[in-house]
């Protein structure tokens, strides 16, 4: 499983987004491109071009660039702006070239049907990771289609950055997550739309780069004591990335953390006996189940459904994750129709839309015809029916 704090990240852009959300004037309903010249932090000027997503009352803008990155431009820093018709997306190779230019020397590009894998690992490792990601991509779409929520096809390649070693990974990750880079082993960043991680097992550095077979690389990796953590991290973060790129969630929309993390933990469960280390969606996530059984907390269900704060508290985050997994597991197994209706509601939330505890409670009640507190006892009874650890 992922490291204890693998997904507990207080993103540095969270406060900025909250500030912008308070004063949103309009969300773009039709694709519109914009070119903005704004004052740069160093006193010069910066040019930003891309798709306009949100405009705030004070003139601040949320723009998505051609490399899929979101940029917030303060209204009082904007010098000029020009509207234009939507540009064609970058070709995969050009997107890859521009992404590689941002990474340290030695990174290479592996292109698959849906992914751009930027890596300084062996080719075999990259191919193993790519095969796992493509398997997840297919399974993700199939699962939600069967749930009654057909998703949008990915319009653009999804970018994944894989470092071979932890030291280089931490140096790069520090720019996104600060000091948390030392305690997490991978993350999906909504602002860059990228997954960043590294070879948790440490085995790839010992591989001969001429070993280009995904099967050979996977066999070595999955025999590692840390294989479960490697697979769970990659699947967990890739699930987030898929959710925010297929219409299940919109980037920077107020999707409750319990939903996004609950879905990711629902998908992440490794199966190390398989060639890729993962196969089944919705298997019992044993570490999460064991934790929620030991530390089920009355009232926490209501708090995670109406607020994200438990996930930001280091003393409570792990238990909150376990409760999120258990709740999603219960709803997905026993209340599928209402669960699909609830996810449909959340998919319609726009970037930086209004959010509050009351709105979250109303949304939950509208879908499930009960309050979060009413779910505790049915959830506990269901968890008691699941088999104990072997």
Where are these regions (language model features)?
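N-terminal secretory signal peptides that target proteins for export/translocation
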Residues: 1-10
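Acidic/His/Gly-enriched intrinsically disordered linker/tail segments
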Residues: 183, 187-197, 229, 233, ...
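Solvent-exposed coil/turn segments that connect beta secondary-structure elements
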Residues: 66-68, 76-78, 83, 122-123, ...
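Bacterial N-terminal signal peptides
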Residues: 12-23
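Compositionally biased alpha-helical segments
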Residues: 27-147, 172-173
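Juxtacatalytic substrate-recognition/specificity segment
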Residues: 104-251, 256, 351, 359-366
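Short, surface-exposed beta-edge/turn micro-motifs
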Residues: 31-34, 157, 325
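Short intrinsically disordered coil segments
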Residues: 90, 175-179, 281
């Amino acid at each position: 499983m992922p490291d204890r704090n693998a997904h507990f990240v207080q993103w540095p852009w969270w406060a900025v987004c909250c500030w912008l959300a308070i004063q949103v004037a309009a969300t773009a309903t039709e694709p519109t491109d914009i070119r903005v010249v704004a004052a740069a932090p160093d006193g010069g000027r910066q040019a930003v071009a891309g798709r306009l997503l949100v405009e705030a009352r004070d003139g601040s803008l949320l723009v998505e660039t051609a490399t899929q990155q979101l940029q917030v431009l303060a209204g009082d820093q904007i010098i000029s702006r020009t509207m234009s018709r939507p540009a064609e997306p970058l070709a995969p190779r050009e997107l890859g070239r521009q992404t590689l230019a941002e990474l340290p020397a030695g990174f290479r590009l592996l292109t698959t049907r849906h992914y751009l894998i930027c890596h300084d690992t062996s080719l075999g490792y990259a191919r193993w990771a790519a095969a796992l990601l493509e398997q997840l991509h297919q399974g993700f779409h199939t699962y939600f289609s069967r749930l009654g929520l057909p998703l949008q096809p990915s319009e653009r390649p999804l970018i994944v950055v894989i470092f071979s070693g932890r030291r280089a990974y931490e140096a790069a990750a520090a720019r996104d997550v600060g000091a948390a880079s030392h305690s997490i082993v991978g993350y999906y960043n909504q602002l860059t739309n990228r997954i960043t991680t590294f070879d948790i097992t440490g085995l790839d550095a010992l591989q001969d780069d001429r070993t280009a077979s995904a099967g050979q690389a996977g066999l070595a990796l999955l025999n590692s004591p840390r294989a479960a953590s490697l697979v769970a991290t990659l699947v967990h973060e890739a699930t987030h990335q898929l959710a925010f790129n297929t219409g299940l969630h919109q980037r920077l929309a107020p999707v409750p953390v319990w939903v996004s993390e609950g879905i990711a933990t629902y998908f992440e469960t490794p199966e190390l006996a398989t060639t890729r280390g993962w196969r089944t969606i919705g298997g019992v996530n044993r570490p999460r189940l064991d934790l929620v059984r030991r530390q089920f907390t009355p009232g926490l269900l209501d708090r995670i459904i109406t607020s994200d704060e438990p996930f930001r508290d280091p003393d409570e985050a792990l238990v909150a994750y376990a409760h999120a997994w258990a709740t999603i597991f219960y709803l997905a197994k026993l209340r599928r129709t209402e669960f699909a209706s609830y996810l449909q509601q959340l998919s319609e939330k726009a970037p930086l839309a209004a959010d509050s505890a009351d709105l979250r409670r109303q949304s939950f009640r509208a879908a499930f015809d009960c309050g979060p507190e009413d779910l505790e006892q049915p959830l506990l009874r269901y968890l008691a029916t699941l088999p104990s650890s072997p």
